[in-house]
Amino acid sequence: MATTEKPVLSKYRDRMDKAVAALKEEFGSLRTGRASASLLDQIHVDAYGSSMPLTQVAAVSVPEPRMITVNVWDRGMVVSVEKAIRQSDLGLNPVVDGQTLRIPIPPLTEERRKDLAKIAGRYAEQQRVAVRNIRRDANEDLRKAQKDNVISQDEEKRMETEVQKMTDEAIKRIDEALKTKEQEIMQV
């Protein structure tokens, strides 16, 4: 039943790839010693009675390696944007200058670097668990397909082995991304 093999496995490979991509996106929001516009991507602002991403109420730019500027489009939103940035767990202190907020990026202390490395480790572990859950779902579907006589027992075992290889590959990519991010965080 080679016709069912490819779509089934590619569906789970796609889900595992999305887990790795989600981790890299989460890592983008972790602060390192340098300014990055993606640092503020996870911040939501209370605007017009609802919570909106910062990028929908302001333009974020990086004019210098250790400075982020946020140009708020609506003057009435400046206080809300400042509050959202201060309340984020990024440890940033914006300076208001009219409709612009200047956010100096202070160098990270050794303690803060270690905390960020732990947070990165937690993010990576969450995605490892997600990949393992995807593997579990794939194996359950394969067992069900074998039970329903859609695939043979030999095909089920072969495909389970392939799912395990995909899982190992995804976890390896997660571990590599974590190692890279930890090195980036710990760099002075």
Curated annotation (Swiss-Prot):
Annotated GO molecular function terms are:
ribosomal large subunit binding
Which family, according to the similarity comment? Answer: Belongs to the RRF family.
**Compartments where located:** Cytoplasm
Q: What is this protein called?
A: Ribosome-recycling factor
Q: What Gene Ontology terms describe where this protein resides (cellular component)?
A: cytosol
Q: Which GO terms describe its biological process?
A: cytoplasmic translational termination
Gene name linked to the record: frr
* SUPFAM superfamilies to which the protein is assigned, alphabetical: Ribosome recycling factor, RRF (SSF55194)
The answer to whether the entry has keyword Protein biosynthesis is yes
- Entry-linked Pfam families: RRF (PF01765)
InterPro entries the record matches: Ribosome_recyc_fac, Ribosome_recyc_fac_dom, RRF_sf
| Gene3D superfamilies noted in UniProt | 3.30.1360.40, Ribosome-recycling factor
Q: Which UniProt keywords apply?
A: Cytoplasm, Protein biosynthesis
- Biological role: Responsible for the release of ribosomes from messenger RNA at the termination of protein biosynthesis. May increase the efficiency of translation by recycling ribosomes from one round of translation to another.
